[in-house]
Every structure is written in C-alpha cells, then in structure tokens.
Design a protein with these regions (language model features):
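Alpha-helix C-terminal capping segments
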Residues: 155-161
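Hydrophobic/aromatic ligand-binding patch that stacks against planar heteroaromatic rings
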Residues: 154-155, 185
Length: 342
C-alpha cells in the first residue's frame, strides 16, 4: 500500500514538474527579450508587446484598420512613481505605439487622442518628432479631448490633421521655468549657504540668494529661444505667419472654437469624427478601429525591483492633496499653462 502511495506521489510530482516546465517555456516564448552585450556582460530587457483591442468593428469584411493611441496626462520623460507608476504614458511607449502602427501594413491611418496640459519641453519635442515622422508614412489625425494645451498642442503640430471639441482647451503656446527663492527665510532662521561654482551662471537658479539682473536676462533668453522654436513649429505646421500667431501665442488658453477661428485646428468634432477623417485620409472607408494595450509580463508584475533599486531613476511623485498634479522640477523648462506650475 505504501509503495502504491509512493508511486502515486512520485507521478504527481513528475506531472507538476512537467507542467511547470511547459508553462515556463511558453512564458519565455511570449516574452520578447532584447539582449545586448555591454562590456562582455549580457543583459536582457523585456519588450512590451502591444496587443490590439477592437474599438469599432469593420463595416465590411476587411483587414484595414485605424489605430487609436492615447496620450494622457503630464508629458514627462521621467518615470512616474508610487500609485501612478503605470498611469501615465512614457515617451518610449508613445514612440513604440507609433512605430508599430507605421510598420503594420494593415494600418491605414492613426488617430492620436491627446488629453494633456503639456509637460517637459524635451519630452514634448521628442513625441512631436515621432508623430511628424509617422505622419510622413501614414495619415495621423489628432483628436483633442478635454485639454491639449502647451506641450499637448506642440505634439499635435506633428499630425496631418487636428480635430478639436467645441469645449477643448488648447493653445497655451509658451514656455515656463520656475524657481523658488528662500534667501529671506534663511536670514530669519539664521541659516546661510556657501556655494563654490566654476562660473558666474552655474547657480543662477539657486533659491539661497536673490538673482542678479544678468542672471534674469540669461534665463529669460533661454525661455525666449524655446518659445521661438515652439512658435516656428506652429507656424510651419499650420501655415500661419508668426506675426499673425502672436495674437493667440502669448500663453493664453483658448477653446476649440477659438482655435478653429485662429487656424490652430482643422475642424470641430468628436473622436468619431476623427475616426471618419482618418478613414478618408487613409482611403479605407470600411476600416475598423483598434486600440493598443501593453501586455503585462512577469517582469512588470514583479516591478523589476532589483533593476530599479540599482538605477534609482528620477521620479515625478504625486501629492494626492494637490489635485493629482506632479511637483514640477525647479529649473526645468515646461510647456504648461501657468496654473499647472503652482
């Protein structure tokens, strides 16, 4: 009897081991690893698979499709921390989605839905460039949701066409850099800071002392340079002279209707109208609409804790008491409405 139970247990253990082995093999097959050699050390990084979810079925049997991509929230190159670690799309995730859509021959056009107040200058510029690059291959229609302001509008300028809702808040064409000065507070509490620099402008944004006039002029020049690039991109994209744009390119936020009147967008409508326009531009009248989603791997589930601990990347931390707005980094240039920088 004991021998029978022993054989049964052995068989069950063997079956369990075979099952685990097969499942692990399937997992490795599904997990696309990007393997690279660095100084003789092999490193593997998981590539995120972008799976498709049907948003609108095709009107007739066809393989043609329109891809819907979302750009939501503050545009940042930094990793979101804490509760919102996966809440915001990264620059890389947007680029990957655009690249996959361009590479897929069945995709006839792209609809990029933007619901963002803007964000970092460089991150916005990178996504704008990716959108512009994609638009050279396939039509890209931007649909502006509740807000596509500042950096959000900057990104939209890379598209083939722009559709906005009547109530969309957009434009806010401008640049902002903030720093906090606490030198008087230091004096009141008896604190002081000694700084050693290699040049007169190395600590221009230090809050430990008042800024000199030449430092203010220096920082303002940086802002002006970035603003001029922003204005130039809008002018080229929309075919509107810079002088004409300056009536609305002073940092103000405008509605979708006002944006249409100022030639900042092409038409008023809803996301369904953006789909319809994409079908026309892509010459795919019966195309369905799909949305990309990330396949969560085991590495994502585990959070790649060891890698994150080793890299210690910069993060944008959220303060739940302040309306879910990120704390902006002092001295970093942003394409944001002023109200988002407070």
């Amino acid at each position: 009897m004991n021998k029978k139970y022993g054989c049964l247990i052995a068989l069950l253990l063997l079956a369990l081991l075979v099952s685990v082995g097969l499942n692990f093999g399937q997992f490795l097959g599904k997990l696309d690893l990007d393997v690279g050699m660095d100084a003789g050390i092999a490193t593997a990084h998981p590539k995120r698979h972008l799976r498709e979810t049907v948003v609108e079925t095709a009107k007739k049997p066809t393989q043609d499709k329109i891809v819907h991509i979302d750009l939501e929230g503050i545009i940042s190159s930094m990793e979101m921390g804490g509760l919102f670690a996966e809440a915001m799309p990264s620059v890389d995730s947007i680029k990957r989605a655009l690249e996959q859509a361009v590479a897929d021959k069945k995709v006839k056009a792209i609809v990029l839905r933007i619901n963002s107040p803007g964000g970092e200058v460089t991150a916005s510029d990178i996504i704008y460039n990716a959108v512009k690059k994609a638009a050279k291959e396939k039509p890209v229609v931007v649909y502006m949701d509740s807000m596509a302001a500042s950096g959000g509008y900057y990104v939209a300028c890379g598209a083939t066409k722009i559709v906005a809702s009547e109530t969309t808040l957009t434009a806010s064409i401008g640049v902002i850099i903030e720093t906090m000065n606490y030198s008087e507070l230091f004096g009141k509490v008896g604190l002081s800071m000694t700084t050693f620099t290699s040049g007169a402008f190395k600590d221009s944004l230090s809050g430990a002392r008042p800024m000199r006039d030449d430092e203010k002029a220096y920082v303002q020049n940086l802002v002006t340079q970035m603003y001029d690039r922003f204005l130039g991109i809008v002018s080229e994209s929309r075919g509107v002279p810079k002088d004409q744009l300056k009536t609305v390119a002073d940092g103000r936020v405008v509605t979708g209707r006002e944006a249409l009147d100022a030639k900042l967008v092409d038409q008023i409508g809803y996301v369904e109208d953006a789909y319809a326009l994409a079908r026309v531009l892509g010459k795919a009248a019966d195309a369905g609409v799909v949305k990309y989603r990330h396949e969560v791997s085991l590495f994502d589930a585990l959070g790649m804790a060891s890698a994150k601990a080793a890299q210690q990347p910069a993060k944008v931390q959220f303060d739940l008491s302040s309306g879910l707005l990120p704390k902006l980094q002092p001295g970093v240039p942003y394409f944001l409405p002023p109200s988002y920088a407070r």
